[in-house]
Regions:
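Short linear sequence motif anchored by a di-proline
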Residues: 1-224
Length: 224
């Protein structure tokens, strides 16, 4: 799974993803956590890339604005096309890119109880994008809530060693696949969900301060 990550500031995202319209202003976050509003990149009907901040934890359109009781921060690739929560936005082409500088995963230690957090980055993309889905759900008060989820998949070798219980990792898009992920037909988009090569990933042990979401500063990504 992917439950915590580092997000760039709005100017960096606008440059990296060539955005033409945005609805945001925010600093970088070193400890993005579920239920927070997170920056995402989407394609408008005219094809232009736009940015917005969405609730992290997908609320399906049929949920009437109420967060499901089960976790929806990650959409497993195995259920992407037919799972009750995901198939609607998938078939409607509601795909997005969730920009990141890196993400955190926890490695269970030899005692079977303690966990060591690791910070994962790429050595070929400073700012990269998770493959995501988004949806809009209107509550009883008539207010629409836009929300998103990160697609996850079986881990590569490095992530198997770090995320050593569930063996999962987020789907990270190759730079050349970003446009197609946003605009292609679902069948083509599905082929873009690939294991990112572990040779292009770096895992760094970091402080357990990251365990607490209220801790949010650059020291969280300093090696220990």
């Amino acid at each position: 799974m992917c439950g915590r990550y580092v997000s760039p500031d709005e100017a960096s995202i606008e440059r990296e993803f060539t955005l033409v319209r945005t609805e945001w202003q925010f600093p970088p976050s070193y400890n993005v956590a579920p239920t927070q509003k997170v920056p995402v990149v989407r394609a408008a009907q005219d094809g232009a890339r736009t940015g917005a901040r969405l609730h992290w934890g997908l609320i399906p359109f049929w949920a009437k604005g109420v967060q499901p009781k089960y976790s929806t921060i990650n959409a497993t690739v195995e259920k992407l096309t037919d799972g009750a929560t995901w198939r609607g936005p998938w078939k409607r082409g509601q795909r997005c890119i969730i920009p990141a500088l890196g993400f955190y995963e926890w490695q269970v230690q030899a005692d079977g109880k303690s966990k060591q957090p690791f910070y994962l980055t790429l050595n070929d993309q400073e700012i990269f994008g998770f493959a995501g889905l988004w949806d809009s759900s209107t509550g009883a008060d008539g207010v629409a809530i836009e929300s998103c989820t990160i697609v996850t998949m079986p881990a590569n070798q490095l992530m198997t060693e770090v995320h050593n219980v569930k063996h999962r990792m987020p789907a990270i898009l190759a730079v050349e696949d970003r446009e197609a992920w946003l605009t292609a037909a679902p069948a083509e988009a599905f082929t873009l969900i690939k294991q990112y090569p572990d040779t292009h990933m770096v895992a760094t042990a970091v402080s357990t301060r990251v365990n607490t979401p209220k801790n949010n500063d650059a020291t969280l990504i300093v090696p220990v």
